[in-house]
Amino acid sequence: MSSTRSQNPHGLKQIGLDQIWDDLRAGIQQVYTRQSMAKSRYMELYTHVYNYCTSVHQSNQARGAGVPPSKSKKGQTPGGAQFVGLELYKRLKEFLKNYLTNLLKDGEDLMDESVLKFYTQQWEDYRFSSKVLNGICAYLNRHWVRRECDEGRKGIYEIYSLALVTWRDCLFRPLNKQVTNAVLKLIEKERNGETINTRLISGVVQSYVELGLNEDDAFAKGPTLTVYKESFESQFLADTERFYTRESTEFLQQNPVTEYMKKAEARLLEEQRRVQVYLHESTQDELARKCEQVLIEKHLEIFHTEFQNLLDADKNEDLGRMYNLVSRIQDGLGELKKLLETHIHNQGLAAIEKCGEAALNDPKMYVQTVLDVHKKYNALVMSAFNNDAGFVAALDKACGRFINNNAVTKMAQSSSKSPELLARYCDSLLKKSSKNPEEAELEDTLNQVMVVFKYIEDKDVFQKFYAKMLAKRLVHQNSASDDAEASMISKLKQACGFEYTSKLQRMFQDIGVSKDLNEQFKKHLTNSEPLDLDFSIQVLSSGSWPFQQSCTFALPSELERSYQRFTAFYASRHSGRKLTWLYQLSKGELVTNCFKNRYTLQASTFQMAILLQYNTEDAYTVQQLTDSTQIKMDILAQVLQILLKSKLLVLEDENANVDEVELKPDTLIKLYLGYKNKKLRVNINVPMKTEQKQEQETTHKNIEEDRKLLIQAAIVRIMKMRKVLKHQQLLGEVLTQLSSRFKPRVPVIKKCIDILIEKEYLERVDGEKDTYSYLA
């Protein structure tokens, strides 16, 4: 009794496989022949499997003859119902094999679409039937199959997976070649413009994907794609390469490159859609790479040649298409960037050369020409090249090159001509005139100026000229707009930092302080003896304004009183300060009483001093005027030239050509009593030519001096931090530190090093060639 209980402790009955198999087999046959099945019949089949799996068998019957029993963890052989299933599993496997062997006979002689229709239809039916069978065998899967797999037995699968493995071995492998070839032929037909039944391909692909079972894990989720990759994708990619190699070569021989690019673009989109419609998504990247290699990379040289043609012809749409294609190739854009940089550089040089000498003295023409080139190619980079950083850099390099070195800089024999012309253009925008644009337009134009400013190498030159011109605008009160002036200084500060604009901002402050000072002086005059003329003053801090001290000058007695009253007033407010008068920048108004009409003359202080002499006499020699005004002869001659040209004064020979007459000490100059002018207010305060030239020379001289100081300061800063440095390293660091202001010339840096050695800031290291050390 005890023996019986150990073999069948719960009194379960023993069911032999033969007892259920005929009915189970008939039911499975019904499933695979797609006959309708009632739910009750399905449950009968399920119950057959369940009853068999839960019946009691001897362990050797459970496993089947010749199969060694599995060992439990304790080395014991578990017996009983746990292991019932192997015989059923083997019968199911045999059934599937026989079913597919018979099915293969119907398809093995088919080709092309016929084999695809056969394969996809049978696959769909088989897949569905196998899922039904998997449900019928659910208990077998959960218990016997799961336990076998857990114990590491190979070649045992969940029933649905077993069905797939059997399909793979018995139907897929024999038909694989003709099915894959049929799929590839169908794809080629579609590439050639024919309409195809894409469901045939997607059906095959779906089958290939699902057949990629994970052999190591019968219950693994998702396929491994091995079958799909090896049996289809590798051949598909090779086919793709052959097809497009032939097509691209033939198309390029018969059509322009622009048409080829459209074709390539269309083909790439087609292949992308192909994956979406009927291939596996994992093929996307491989297929794209293959197409890009064949359609683009192999023809890069042709693209490079065409790129230049498209630039020359301004074919922006085609350039954009080329960019989109070539950007798909790794490092493919390098050559296009170089070609673009060279092209923009050449276009910039040609545009400036076309302006000729006119641009040398016409800042507006020069800057506008530069901006036109930049605007054109900036728009190209944004629209055609997607504002790609590499193409933006090519634009920047090209603009930097042609702006700092072109026909105008060569004519001027100075690379500093560009910043000077840009500063003069700013002056023309910010100076009061009848042509001043509206505020919004002016702001937009100043933004455009900053575009050019970005590319200027010698920013210190721009700053010097800009400061000179700003100073004159402020002193002569002819700024178009204080807001625009402040806006421009703010833009420069943003671009170059506080130090770059500190003097410009100080100038503004001085003008504000001077307004308050004038109010205080007027108030002071009302409380004491008033002046008998209008008088205003600007007090400028000497370190911030780019003006030189005044030359010798004897103030006319008519102006002496104003001068003395203000000097005394200022001294009472600021006892420690000394005023230095800039007569060359001062101006005033004179009213005439000696001509037919009464005129108001707007004149410089020097002009006033000369004209006031004629209150006493009608004629003076040049020497007499020099003695009475104390103005140096070279400056006096220029002032007299302007007065002679305005016809207020005349030479003794009234018909003589003023430009051709050399003024000598004994030259007699008379007041012209027949003076006439259509205007009653006449501005005779025009700049002197030699004064402008001298100013320009002084500015350039100051720039060179300032540069030397900046270079020396940079060297000291670097050496203080590094202590010891090789010559080449020092040069490199100086160039890096100062490149945002200007490009220092190497000979000047060397000279500055020598100066600092003399001043004992540095010394040469003994025994080491070209090495310097810092002296604390």
Swiss-Prot record:
PTM note: Neddylated; which enhances the ubiquitination activity of SCF. Neddylation prevents binding of the inhibitor CAND1. Neddylation leads to structural rearrangment in the complex that allows interaction between the E2 ubiquitin-conjugating enzyme and the acceptor ubiquitin. Deneddylated via its interaction with the COP9 signalosome (CSN) complex.
Location of cross-link Glycyl lysine isopeptide (Lys-Gly) (interchain with G-Cter in NEDD8): K720
Biological pathway: Protein modification; protein ubiquitination
Statement: the UniProt record of this protein carries the keyword Transcription regulation: no
Domain Cullin neddylation residues, every copy: 706-766
UniProt cross-references to PROSITE patterns, sorted A to Z: CULLIN_1, CULLIN_2
Modified residues (Omega-N-methylarginine): R63
Biological processes per GO annotation: animal organ morphogenesis; cell population proliferation; G1/S transition of mitotic cell cycle; intrinsic apoptotic signaling pathway; positive regulation of canonical NF-kappaB signal transduction; proteasome-mediated ubiquitin-dependent protein catabolic process; protein K48-linked ubiquitination; protein monoubiquitination
Keywords: Host-virus interaction, Isopeptide bond, Methylation, Ubl conjugation, Ubl conjugation pathway
Gene Ontology CC annotation, any one: Parkin-FBXW7-Cul1 ubiquitin ligase complex
Tissue: Expressed in lung fibroblasts.
Gene3D superfamilies: Cullin Repeats (1.20.1310.10), Ring Box Chain A, domain 5 (4.10.1030.10), Winged helix-like DNA-binding domain superfamily/Winged helix DNA-binding domain (1.10.10.10)
GO molecular function term, any single one: protein-macromolecule adaptor activity
Function according to Swiss-Prot or TrEMBL: Core component of multiple cullin-RING-based SCF (SKP1-CUL1-F-box protein) E3 ubiquitin-protein ligase complexes, which mediate the ubiquitination of proteins involved in cell cycle progression, signal transduction and transcription. SCF complexes and ARIH1 collaborate in tandem to mediate ubiquitination of target proteins. In the SCF complex, serves as a rigid scaffold that organizes the SKP1-F-box protein and RBX1 subunits. May contribute to catalysis through positioning of the substrate and the ubiquitin-conjugating enzyme.
Family: Belongs to the cullin family.
Domain free text: The Cullin neddylation domain restrains the RING domain of RBX1 in the E3 ubiquitin-protein ligase complex; this restraint is removed upon neddylation of the cullin.
Subunit architecture: Component of multiple Cul1-RING E3 ubiquitin-protein ligase complexes commonly known as SCF (SKP1-CUL1-F-box) complexes, consisting of CUL1, SKP1, RBX1 and a variable F-box domain-containing protein as substrate-specific subunit. Component of the SCF(FBXW11) complex containing FBXW11. Component of the SCF(SKP2) complex containing SKP2, in which it interacts directly with SKP1, SKP2 and RBX1. Component of the SCF(FBXW2) complex containing FBXW2. Component of the SCF(FBXO32) complex containing FBXO32. Component of the probable SCF(FBXO7) complex containing FBXO7. (Microbial infection) Interacts with Epstein-Barr virus BPLF1.
Official protein name in the record: Cullin-1
Organism of origin: Homo sapiens (Human)
